[in-house]
């Protein structure tokens, strides 16, 4: 943010001259109410104890020192010492060439330089197609990866393939039961069972490829069904994610943890740290020492590993790969698992290096009516179906339209409407509207001036200045979205910028004004279009030129 950087620079110089240290809790940000100016700061109050002065007296000192700054038009003091800054029009006008010169790099920063982050997301069991809930986690994870890379982090995106354990056995059994039923055998459905139509399809494919399977034992047949089902479903998942423009750099197999002896290596490490012990033939994690209400089993007395054991070994492997920060994106139903996993990471000597983001449920609606879903019962809307119906852009934007730990209502009919009530259309149409103005200008023989020749001083009305001020916030919004692991703030920002553009468009006849004003407005609109496109790119959403 250019305005914030300017204030940090000039205030930093004043503090240095006075022998004061920059206060840790000093905040510079746009005020909630625009009547207080362009930026506000609490720095005078944060300096009071250090400077041994009344906050208002400090504010008055700063106000006096800034008198004559060519970019700061006015400094007001409010209440006990809040500082409110109003910048000159020329300051905002100078932002436009910066936006257009940087182009696709406008808003990019290096705050994450030399920090290696792994983001693990989706990681759905390969037991069925991806559903709408997985789609929300996929959009969130992919958007976070884009934002982190945009702000300078070294990022790796990973999918954890749960290809070991009980759910895979249930998948194999489900396919085997359906296969036998299709051949006239009187087999009852087991209690734990996947019932979707895709199971019948997989059963038919297994039979076609293994005509002798009906003569095999249950164990042999289930093993074949399990492996075939897992491989086919995983290929389908990869295909769906590719169509959704979601990237994973690594597909990590849970099975590999056992075959590579990584689980036992982690157990040995925990024992060496005094965080695991044997009792009653089982291996336990001493999680009570780290705040858990009870110790947790890692290996049962019968030798079977718990899910928790694999998860600890998996995270141990992540840190051994050199990641400074590990981000896990989980469904909200895993919230109770977080303290246990945080304790395990701490036991491995990596306290504070795990961030968990929870993704709440999606309520899928059609014309205001909720669509009932159940994965086990086979009644669910697949991600593929939703994307095919409403499009990738609409799906991604809707998934990112609210904070991830908030429930999301996704109305399939609403996002197909070409109206301003549709949030996806509202933002994309702002970009398309600018492109339409550019085409009309060309049709009328109006040329867009070169950046350095544009008469930007003609941009002085409130709507024009508001667009410039909002564009200035983009880099800060992107940085905060990455630092706080909150991709949804990008969609909030884009709606604000789109709203300002639509307001400007409705209040001013862009191509019916003084020649200099028209020229300056066209360059301004180019900068707004670039900022919108950069923001939409972070969401993985296109910026159409017409709609």
Curated annotation (Swiss-Prot):
One of its GO terms (biological process) is arginyl-tRNA aminoacylation. It is found in: Cytoplasm. Belongs to the class-I aminoacyl-tRNA synthetase family. The keyword rRNA-binding does not apply. The keyword RNA-binding does not apply. This is Arginine--tRNA ligase. It catalyses: tRNA(Arg) + L-arginine + ATP = L-arginyl-tRNA(Arg) + AMP + diphosphate. Monomer. It is an enzyme of class 6 (ligase). A motif ('HIGH' region) lies at residues 124-134. GO terms for molecular function: arginine-tRNA ligase activity; ATP binding. It comes from Maridesulfovibrio salexigens (strain ATCC 14822 / DSM 2638 / NCIMB 8403 / VKM B-1763) (Desulfovibrio salexigens). Its EC number is 6.1.1.19. One of its GO terms (cellular component) is cytoplasm. Keywords: Aminoacyl-tRNA synthetase, ATP-binding, Cytoplasm, Ligase, Nucleotide-binding, Protein biosynthesis.
């Amino acid at each position: 943010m250019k305005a914030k950087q300017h204030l940090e620079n000039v205030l930093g110089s004043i503090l240095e001259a006075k022998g004061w240290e920059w206060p840790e809790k000093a905040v510079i940000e746009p005020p909630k109410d625009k009547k207080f100016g362009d930026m506000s700061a609490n720095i005078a109050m944060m300096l009071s104890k250090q400077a041994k002065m009344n906050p208002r007296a400090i504010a008055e000192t700063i106000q006096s020192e800034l008198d004559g700054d060519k970019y700061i038009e006015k400094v007001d003091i409010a209440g006990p010492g809040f500082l409110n800054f109003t910048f000159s029009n020329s300051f905002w006008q100078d932002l436009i060439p910066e936006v257009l010169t940087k182009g696709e790099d406008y808003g990019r920063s290096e705050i994450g330089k030399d920090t290696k982050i792994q983001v693990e997301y989706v990681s759905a069991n390969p037991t069925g197609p991806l559903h709408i809930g997985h789609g929300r986690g996929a959009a969130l994870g992919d958007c976070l990866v884009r934002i982190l890379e945009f702000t300078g982090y070294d990022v790796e995106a990973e999918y954890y393939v749960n290809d070991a354990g009980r759910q895979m056995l249930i998948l194999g059994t489900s396919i085997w039961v359906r296969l036998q039923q299709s051949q006239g055998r009187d087999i009852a459905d087991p209690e734990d069972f996947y019932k979707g139509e895709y199971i019948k399809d997989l059963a038919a494919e297994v039979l076609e490829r293994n005509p002798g399977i009906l003569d095999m034992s249950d164990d042999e047949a289930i093993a074949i069904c399990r492996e075939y089902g897992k491989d086919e479903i995983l290929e389908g998942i990869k295909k769906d994610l590719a169509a959704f423009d979601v990237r994973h750099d690594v597909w990590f197999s849970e099975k590999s943890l056992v075959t590579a002896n990584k689980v036992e290596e982690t157990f040995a490490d925990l024992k060496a740290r005094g965080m695991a012990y044997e009792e009653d033939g089982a291996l336990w994690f001493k999680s009570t020492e780290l705040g858990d209400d009870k110790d947790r089993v890692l290996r049962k007395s019968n030798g079977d590993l718990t899910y928790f054991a694999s998860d600890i070994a998996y995270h141990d492997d992540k840190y051994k790969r050199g990641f400074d920060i590990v981000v896990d994106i989980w469904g909200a139903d895993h919230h109770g698992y977080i303290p246990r996993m945080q304790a395990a990471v701490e036991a491995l000597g990596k306290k504070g290096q795990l961030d968990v983001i929870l993704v709440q449920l999606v309520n899928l609606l059609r014309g205001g009516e909720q669509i009932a879903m159940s994965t086990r019962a086979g009644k669910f809307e697949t991600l593929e179906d939703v994307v095919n119906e409403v499009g990738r852009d609409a799906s991604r934007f809707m998934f990112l339209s609210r904070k991830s730990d908030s429930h999301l209502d996704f109305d399939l009919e609403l996002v197909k409407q070409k109206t301003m009530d549709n949030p996806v259309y509202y933002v994309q149409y702002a970009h398309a509207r600018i492109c339409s103005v550019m085409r009309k200008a060309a049709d009328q023989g109006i040329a867009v001036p070169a950046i350095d020749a544009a008469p930007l001083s003609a941009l002085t009305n409130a709507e024009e200045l508001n667009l410039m001020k909002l564009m200035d916030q983009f880099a800060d919004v992107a940085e905060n979205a990455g630092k706080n692991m909150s991709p949804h703030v990008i969609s909030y920002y884009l709606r604000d910028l789109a709203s300002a553009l639509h307001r400007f468009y409705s209040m001013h006849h862009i191509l019916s004004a003084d020649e200099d004003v028209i020229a300056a407005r066209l360059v301004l609109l180019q900068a707004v279009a670039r900022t919108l496109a950069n923001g939409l790119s972070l969401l993985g959403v296109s910026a159409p030129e017409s709609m």
